[in-house]
């Protein structure tokens, strides 16, 4: 399996405890060849009297900061929307020099042309340098990575040198490979300047180089929980020297099911460590984790205390039906691609939808690429590199990329499928408007998402966004029980999908197998997939064009509003379809990107003006 050293690694870094082979979700088979991650790790019994002492309070208040009055501090915190809870919280630093970082660190900061600390850095640095446990709750793009990395360097510099067989002094746990790599990219420059070694360990990559880094000794280690547990179980590293622990995007790690692994890892670390937890939201599960792992911690919140989105993002919600999404997406992309800054992330719910939408858009000539959890690490790295450098300005992604994907110039986010929670919605749209920049988020919201409508409206109101009246109508329909085709937005899917006859799908996901709403001459138990309005008598396997479409010389015509093309053997054809992009193989290995040959159609309904008069 390309890119993965084992199937077990692949499952672990997605948060699943049971192995893919040899067991089940209920637990391993009786032979116990494979087990749950971390089951070989024994919880350590710590005697603090026997442990070597270490220092963790290095903070010296700058004279300029000492002269600052309590009223001036409070005025600054209000201006930056900083809320602090806890005892003896230090004053925020207003300038980099007030943090008293080493000269090597200040040189790197100067080269990066930073003007002043962000809000979370200003308040977080004094807390972390004081050796206090802390929780930082801040929106994405707020500079939290440096908030814990620079104090980590100071912490490491004050500890004894590593000896042979020692593990890392600083451990950063991250939920995804992408986030771990991005943290490592930031850490590498600062650690190199301070003559410290930093490494990144994650699943989906060869273990050998990662093991060699650990065996040579590294002061700083960024890791995903699954791969770290692998190395702890087989004795390739240990956490005996770890005194500075960071849980980055703790809410995301809990969402991905990593809590058991996190607890196993923390059990291997001495209890008098310094712990910093970072999160974009503050649900009860994260609060419980903080109570279990942190002691007398300082809680720092940036922005509104309730669920909130970045106010620099223009949020536009289009209430529609599922069968309308494809057409609306194409119209929207035609408008976006005419802009000079057009880097766009399209979020979908499932891996299957990601692959299908990527293939469809590339067949139509759009420079799109897809990324999700089942892609090999090599392919994911390549796709992200193409996206970051603008060679493929459209990235179609599942939630694997919704947090931690740090690309500065993403201008647009499109929620093709609305996520399961408003927390995920906020994280998704947070991929744009990084730092102080602006961005736009478009969302397709269907009656099937009605359970999230109230939360979405709350997020929009908090951010002072115009609210589509159709959203308010959905709230009324939900209260009156009319939301599912009995009033309000009429649910016309039955007529669209089955030409007046009930199509026989049992769930919404079955309905998704009909992408455009035209019937097929074939009858399948789960519904043959008829993409883009195909009406064909060709043989289907699993109803998917392009991978399991068996034509045996039969030609099927695509009628979608674009020039009719002829496809044989799925979509692998030299026939040009809508643009000059031949020979599309699984959405990859194209000769060149080409924008649609036809002139961009005028936008309908985007952007929605205030009041939504259309």
Curated annotation (Swiss-Prot):
It catalyses: ATP + H2O = ADP + phosphate + H(+). It holds the Pfam family P68HR. SMART domains: DEXDc (SM00487), HELICc (SM00490), P68HR (SM01414). The modification N6-acetyllysine is found at residues 32-33, 40, 236. The modification Phosphotyrosine is found at residue 297. Sumoylated; sumoylation, promoted by PIAS1, promotes interaction with HDAC1 and transcriptional repression activity. Sumoylation also significantly increases stability, and reduces polyubiquitination. There is a cross-link at residues 32, 45, 53, 340, 343, 388, 391, 411, 437, 451, 470, 523 (Glycyl lysine isopeptide (Lys-Gly) (interchain with G-Cter in SUMO2)). One of its GO terms (cellular component) is spliceosomal complex. Residues 477-614 are annotated as: Transactivation domain. Residues 1-15, 488-498 have a biased composition (Basic and acidic residues). It comes from the Eukaryota. Residues 328-475 form the Helicase C-terminal domain. PROSITE patterns: DEAD_ATP_HELICASE, HELICASE_ATP_BIND_1, HELICASE_CTER, Q_MOTIF. One of its GO terms (biological process) is nuclear-transcribed mRNA catabolic process. Transmembrane segments: none annotated. The keyword Acyltransferase does not apply. CDD domains: DEADc_DDX5, SF2_C_DEAD. PANTHER family: ATP-DEPENDENT RNA HELICASE DBP3. Involved in the alternative regulation of pre-mRNA splicing; its RNA helicase activity is necessary for increasing tau exon 10 inclusion and occurs in a RBM4-dependent manner. Binds to the tau pre-mRNA in the stem-loop region downstream of exon 10. The rate of ATP hydrolysis is highly stimulated by single-stranded RNA. Involved in transcriptional regulation; the function is independent of the RNA helicase activity. Transcriptional coactivator for androgen receptor AR but probably not ESR1. Belongs to the DEAD box helicase family. DDX5/DBP2 subfamily. This is Probable ATP-dependent RNA helicase DDX5. It comes from Pan troglodytes.
């Amino acid at each position: 399996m390309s890119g993965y050293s084992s199937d077990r690694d692949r499952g672990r870094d997605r948060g699943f405890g049971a192995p893919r082979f040899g067991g089940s979700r209920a637990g391993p088979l009786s032979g116990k060849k494979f087990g749950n991650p971390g089951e070989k790790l024994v919880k350590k019994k710590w005697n603090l009297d026997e442990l070597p002492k270490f220092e963790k309070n290095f903070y010296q208040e700058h004279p300029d900061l000492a002269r600052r009055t309590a009223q001036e501090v409070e005025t600054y915190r209000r201006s930056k929307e900083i809320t602090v809870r806890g005892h003896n919280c230090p004053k925020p630093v207003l300038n980099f020099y007030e943090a008293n970082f080493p000269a090597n660190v200040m040189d790197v900061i100067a080269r990066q042309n930073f003007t002043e600390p962000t809000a979370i850095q200003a308040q977080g640095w004094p807390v972390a340098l004081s050796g206090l446990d802390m929780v930082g709750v801040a929106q994405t793009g707020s500079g939290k990575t440096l908030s814990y990395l620079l104090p980590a360097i100071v912490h490491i510099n004050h500890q004894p040198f590593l000896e042979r067989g020692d593990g890392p002094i600083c451990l950063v746990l991250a939920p995804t490979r992408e986030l771990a790599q991005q943290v490592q990219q930031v850490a590498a420059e600062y650690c190199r300047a301070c003559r410290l070694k930093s490494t990144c360990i994650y699943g989906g990559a060869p273990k050998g180089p990662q093991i060699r880094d650990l065996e040579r000794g590294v002061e700083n280690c960024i890791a995903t929980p699954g791969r770290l547990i692998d190395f702890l179980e087989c004795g390739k590293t240990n956490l005996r020297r770890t005194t500075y622990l960071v849980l980055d995007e703790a809410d995301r790690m809990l969402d991905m099911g990593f809590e058991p692994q996190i607890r196993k890892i923390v059990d291997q670390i001495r209890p008098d460590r310094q712990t910093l937890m970072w999160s974009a939201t503050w649900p009860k599960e994260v609060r419980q984790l903080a109570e279990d792992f942190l002691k007398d911690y300082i809680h720092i919140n940036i922005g509104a205390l309730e669920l909130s989105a970045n106010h620099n993002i223009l949020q536009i919600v289009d209430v529609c039906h599922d069968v309308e999404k494809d057409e609306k997406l194409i119209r929207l992309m035609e408008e976006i691609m005419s802009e000079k800054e057009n880097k766009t992330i399209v979020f979908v719910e499932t891996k299957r939808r990601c692959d299908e939408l990527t293939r469809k858009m590339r067949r139509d000539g759009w420079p799109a690429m897809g990324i999700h959890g089942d892609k090999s690490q090599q392919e994911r790295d390549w796709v992200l590199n193409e996206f970051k450098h603008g060679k493929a300005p459209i990235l179609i992604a599942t939630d694997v990329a919704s947090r931690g994907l740090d690309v500065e110039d993403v201008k647009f986010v499109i929620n093709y499928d609305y996520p399961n929670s408003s927390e995920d919605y906020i994280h998704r749209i947070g991929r744009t408007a990084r730092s102080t920049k602006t961005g736009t988020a478009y969302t397709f919201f269907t009656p099937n998402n009605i359970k999230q409508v109230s939360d979405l409206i709350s997020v929009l109101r908090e951010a002072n966004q115009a609210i589509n009246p159709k959203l308010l109508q959905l709230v009324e329909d939900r209260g009156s029980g009319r939301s599912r085709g009995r009033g309000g937005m009429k649910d016309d899917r039955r007529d669209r999908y089955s030409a007046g006859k009930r199509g026989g799908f049992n769930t919404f996901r079955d309905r998704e197998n009909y992408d455009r709403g035209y019937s097929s001459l074939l009858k399948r138990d789960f519904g043959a997939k008829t993409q883009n309005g195909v009406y064909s008598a060709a043989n289907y396997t699993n109803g998917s064009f392009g991978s399991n479409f068996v034509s045996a010389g039969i030609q099927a015509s695509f009628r979608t509003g674009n020039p009719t093309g002829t496809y044989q053997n799925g979509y692998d054809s030299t026939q040009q379809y809508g643009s000059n992009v031949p020979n599309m193989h699984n959405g990859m290995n194209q000769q060149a990107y080409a924008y649609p040959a036809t002139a961009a159609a005028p936008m309908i309904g985007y952007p929605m003006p205030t009041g939504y008069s259309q």
